[in-house]
Amino acid sequence: MFTMKKTLLVLFFLGVVSLSLCVEERDADEEDGGEVMEEEVKRGALRGCWTKSYPPKPCKGK
């Protein structure tokens, strides 16, 4: 029971730290003039390789 409480406490702490960092970053972005810079999101290297067919088809690289 003690290890479960300890684990939950660590997860709670990490969540609070993560939330705090997100708030700081958002505040910093607002101070820069409120502009949101769009960045191209690179998709995973295996995009298009995974199909619902079995056996899986080989991946054709880009």
Swiss-Prot record:
Family membership: Belongs to the frog skin active peptide (FSAP) family. Brevinin subfamily.
Compartments in which it is found: Secreted
Tissue expression as described in the entry: Expressed by the skin granular glands.
One Pfam family in the UniProt entry: Antimicrobial23
Name recorded for this polypeptide: Ranacyclin-T
Location of Lysine amide modifications: 60
Domain of life: Eukaryota
GO cellular component, one term: extracellular region
Signal peptide residue numbers: 1-22
Cysteines paired by S-S bonds: 49-59
GO biological process, one term: killing of cells of another organism
Propeptide segment residues: 23-43
Alphabetical UniProt keywords: Amidation, Amphibian defense peptide, Antibiotic, Antimicrobial, Cleavage on pair of basic residues, Cytolysis, Disulfide bond, Fungicide, Hemolysis, Secreted, Signal
Function: Has antibacterial activity against Gram-positive bacteria B.megaterium Bm11, S.lentus and M.luteus, and Gram-negative bacteria E.coli D22, Y.pseudotuberculosis YP III and P.syringae pv tabaci, and antifungal activity against C.albicans ATCC 10231, C.tropicalis, C.guiller-mondii and P.nicotianae spores. Has weak hemolytic activity. The mature peptide inserts into the hydrophobic core of the bacterial cell membrane and increases permeability without disrupting membrane integrity. Probably binds to the outer membrane surface before aggregating to form transmembrane pores.
